[in-house]
Amino acid sequence: MKKIIAITGPTASGKTSLSIKIAKKFNLEIINCDSTQIYQQYNIGTAKITKEEMEGVKHHLLDFLPPEEKYSIYHFQKSARAKIKDINNPLFVGGSGLYLKAALFDYELTPKPLMPQNVCEQDLQKMLAIIKEKDPQLVLDTKNPLRIISSYYDIVSGHLRSQKTKKNVPLYSLLIFYLDIDRKELKNRVVLRLEKMLNEGFVEEVKNIQTNFPQANFNIIGYREIKDFLEGKYSITEAKNKICQKTMQYAKRQKTWFKNQLQPVVVDALSPSLEKKVFQLVFDFLHKRS
């Protein structure tokens, strides 16, 4: 079974720096697992690694999509698994847990269907009846029209959602690290990083995307708030406060999700022995017989 390592954790926890050290020491190639860093132009606000910071380490699925192009977790699953086949020693790096799980665990996503417009209540009830007949084991939120429509199209295309039960079965031999960090220290880092981003031209970056790529995705922490600031909805101070608040809320959800879904090796991001501990675990993992 192929061996794959992943470095996860909240923003500003040190994933990038540690990943480069691991990749260089063990001759690994990095597969980006940050759903925002796949896009071109989104550089400062996503803390995208620079060419200099890469130190010659090869990166995949990074900075390759035009800002207005649609790309889903389905596309990432296909792209990442293709990369895994091509790369001898992959190292996933990023905080997008759903993307990571889709790439590494035994379930297949299907393309999201185009949802029909103006579906009436009668149509939804017909769809529900077919779902209950064809897939009676499925537990479905019957008050969510999008869920009903999506489940219906799954059945029409021959996929029963209730049978997609292998979500916790890995396709590969995995070593997943989660960089844990004291919440107070994380907040300090988030505030400092945001100030650095603003000094480096984050506002100008958002303005450029707004002007040249009006259909681009702004539903990203930081980009949404700066866009609202540029549109006069609130001051830069309010925007900064909202960015920090949302980043910390997201970090809390991330931690819970990763621990529950992926059972990672949790390591202290602030520990003086972090590098030594991780290197030893990686060495043991790569050299043990699978």
From Swiss-Prot:
E.C. numbers: 2.5.1.75
Record's catalysed reaction(s): adenosine(37) in tRNA + dimethylallyl diphosphate = N(6)-dimethylallyladenosine(37) in tRNA + diphosphate
Cofactors required: Mg(2+)
GO molecular function, one term: tRNA dimethylallyltransferase activity
Region of interest: Interaction with substrate tRNA: 34-37
InterPro entries attached to this UniProt entry: Dimethylallyltransferase, IPT, P-loop_NTPase
Keyword Disulfide bond in record: no
Keyword Cell cycle: no
Keywords on record: ATP-binding, Magnesium, Nucleotide-binding, Transferase, tRNA processing
Pfam families linked: IPPT
Residues that, per the record, bind ATP: G9, P10, T11, A12, S13, G14, K15, T16
Binding site for substrate: T11, A12, S13, G14, K15, T16
Example of a GO biological process term: tRNA modification
NCBIfam families: miaA (TIGR00174)
The protein's assembly and partners: Monomer.
Family to which the UniProt record says this protein belongs: Belongs to the IPP transferase family.
Protein name: tRNA dimethylallyltransferase
Organism: Phytoplasma australiense
Phylogenetic lineage: Bacteria, Bacillati, Mycoplasmatota, Mollicutes, Acholeplasmatales
